[in-house]
Amino acid sequence: MTVAGKAMQSETHSPPIPDDEPDGRDVAAYVAALIASERLGHLVVHHRVLPATPAVFADPARPFSRAVAGLLTAKGIPALYSHQARATDLARAGRHVAVATPTASGKTMTYLLPVLEEVIRNPDSRAIFLYPLKALAQDQQKAIRELAASLPESARPTTAIYDGDTSPHFRRKIRDNPPHILITNPEMLHLSLLPNHENWGALFAGLSHVVVDEMHTYRGVMGSHMAHVFRRLTRVCRRFGTSPAYVFSSATIGNPGQLAEDLTGLPVTTVTESGAPTAARHFLFLNPEQSAATTAVMLLAAALKRGLRTIVYTQSRKMTELISLWIREKAGPYASRVSAYRSGFLAEERRDIEAAMASGKLLGVVSTSALELGIDIGGLDLCILCGYPGSVMSAWQRGGRVGRAGRESAVVLIAGEDALDQYFMRHPAEFFDRPPESAVINPANPAIAAKHLECAAAELPIELTDPLLADAGIRAEAERLEQQGLLLRDREGTRYFAARKRPHRDVNLRGSGGQFTIEAGGAVIGQIDEMRAYRETHPGAVYIHRGVSYLVTALDIPERRVVVAPGTVDYYTRARGQKTTEILEVLGEKQVNGVPVFLGRLKVTETVTGYERRRARGGQLLSIVPLDLPPMVFETEGLWWVIPQDVQAELDKRLFHFMGAIHAMEHAMIGILPLLVLTDRNDLGGISTPLHPQVGRACVFVYDGAPGGVGLTRLAFAKADEALSRTLAAVAGCPCETGCPSCVHSPKCGSGNRPIDKVAARYLLELLMSGKLPETDPCRPEGLISNEPPQAGEPQAADKPKAAKAKNAPGRYGVLDVETRRAAAEVGGWGNAHKMGVSVAVLYDSGLDDCITYAQDELPALYEALTRLDLVVGFNILRFDYKVLAGASPFDHRKLPTLDILERVHARLGYRLSLDGLAKATLGTQKSASGLEALAWWKEGRIDEIAAYCKQDVIVTRDLYTFGRDNGYLLFSNKAGKIVRLPVEWE
């Protein structure tokens, strides 16, 4: 039975937890009642009390200034915790530091004190405080003002929030007079500060510190983007002569220093040992008989009646809305004191909920990970995790939201049906013993790197020696952008300029694709990213927003919008689809127990082919509705296991369902990988195939779900042996017989978890682990696309121009230009070029190395000469010269091999350039006259002058052609007045 189906079932009337205790926020009494409960007590598989720990204090190596010491005294802070003292020492010394200690350990002081001290010492100094959420910025400004309140008003540091809600008037005031502490977010840094750095001179010239809060959120796609944003920030600071110290604040993760260094490319010192005290905390693991959602509703209802301030975390937007809806039905008089909270809400809705929770108006909130970060919603007593959050880090981070200010608290993990949930129900001690996962990013993601190279070049020209281009893959991306006309080299070929002035708005830092708006009745009610839009908001899908059910009536892909209408139905929907993969490049290979494992670049094609309607009560399949949606095609990184032929033969001999075995292995491995990598299964995709055409063997693929890849499967490849053993343990340890969501079923399987054979999968994994049937063939894929970047130290395009290959150069070519008798205005516009008539036509013939002039009555001879050429070159020849000729005399140019230089320029740049402009920049010459003068000469009978002018145009066009052929580029003056290169290939 599905989660939704179970959750909608009626309950017995006895309360799960006796609620006859007086209100008083007594967490211990709540926990005792839960354990003693007849309905739920026997489902508690583990209860651990984490004891309170005392504070560990330390003095900074150098005493704070009198002003800062006075701030601490006024705030009632007699001493710093040990981690605060260590981190402030580093930040005050100008070192880059990453502080990764538990939630509510006082990390704010580690960066606030050094910044305040520097501002008081040097009023010209500035700092940027970067927060991933607007609400965090509001909280931080309040904290700064409270701490600085004891200073004389004239000495208090100024602060300002600069985000999307800041009015244009205040934005201008902030730019003109930057505050000591500018509080902003990644988007504003990317979209406003960096591209307009000349308007922020006082900020960047005085920048001493950059504070990055919630660093652990900068992983995956967003982290890969931010790695480039921080490098761009470093370039701009270098332009203003500053080198600010970075201070990172993070939840406890496995690699804070490595992540900070990957984000910035700078050496970073870590502080991970917390000196903050902690209150006692109960941790309970509960494996429900009903769904996790049903159990969460029961626990929340009981907590509300006891006055416990509670947060419930769910794994999806949909489940957040459903639990919020169901608790209102169960909570009686407390129904109005609970709200849902998720990222799809509009900003003003989220702010209202945060304020109501902080004030105590709300007792409970049901949230996605959107409230995992340190937004101030007041002191909480109870955290209910409706399903394992996907990582040990997230579980501790969410649990850390409760029990602040020394209050006893409790965290209840309610297991779902997923593999990791059940894994920890069977091995609870491992949850507490496991170190937190490592966060990974992939700055080398080509799709992401290319976007930021263009942004960086728009901010400041990129020298070929710039550290941005140190990586060979990034250099290759720069060359590709140059070939596309998005980056332009200067005349000397030593610097890149951006072709566009503001490419920044085409870059979405928080996703690899764009956002779709969700509209109801003409009003925007939410947003969804492109990858999810196809699966969750396809036509006919059920979409829930703030407890209201909607039906999707249209998915408008060109306009990037989803149209929904309110609708009450007794079913939910689940997308169905199919996927294929092509191997583009092998990045790594090894063997695990004799099994070949590869890492590489993949092209994934995913098509949503339809959707299931399933009854809300019980999950019964009602119907399958076909859909006709375009495929999603993207390149990413992934790993694949090649199943040895002897292993497949062994399964076939035992009459196992081989496709069911590898399909189950794929699901189980995706489910278990979040134990090894900081991610959740929704960030990964998989494909299993009994015969991959490039490999010639059965393969199981697991890939990064984000275009370009974000490093998840790279880390999984490094831990491939552990991934295999963990997958076997998950399958073998599950008590089900034929497969379930706890081992080999996937909640997002596009084929409805068919075929699946758990028994066969277990046998398959045991054979792979045994090493008894190794694959002797290397199994390297065939038909790879060679796309190797240049090696370090290899000369780049500035040193070795991409001249046209000899085999592509024509043996005999001509250059043609035509002058007319009549102007466009005389024949009704440029569309009537065929009515203009020919005054003179000039053809340069490379075989003769001479120019021949033709009058209108000599055009048949011109046509005959053209047919003898291997290539005809012109400037606007296709749209103009050929049309003029066709109107003057019967002429069919379609069989002539033609190169139109203007057409190539337009295709590369997106706009047109004049022949005169190209000639001046490239050749240092120019046209001898203009077309208007030639028209006047025709009326005056000055044919020789027209012929001389036309011949000069032909010579200029010829020289542009040969320059581009020999050098691989032309030169032109861009919109900023810079002489830059335009790459060309005359093929």
Can you describe what each PLM-predicted range is?
Residues 32-75, 79-82, 86, 92-190, ...:
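Helicase motor core with emphasis on the C-terminal RecA-like subdomain
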Residues 802-871:
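Conserved RNase H-like, two-metal-ion catalytic cores of nucleic-acid enzymes
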Residues 843-917:
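Conserved DEDDh/DEDDy metal-dependent 3′-5′ exonuclease domain
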Residues 408-411, 417-434, 452-464, 480, ...:
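Extended Lys/Arg-rich polyanion-binding regions
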Residues 367, 386, 546, 605, ...:
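Short His-Asn-centered micro-motif
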Residues 923-982:
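Acidic, Mg2+-coordinating catalytic module of metal-dependent nucleases/exonucleases
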Residues 780, 787-811:
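N-terminal accessory regions of nucleic-acid-interacting proteins
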Residues 734, 739-743:
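Short cysteine clusters
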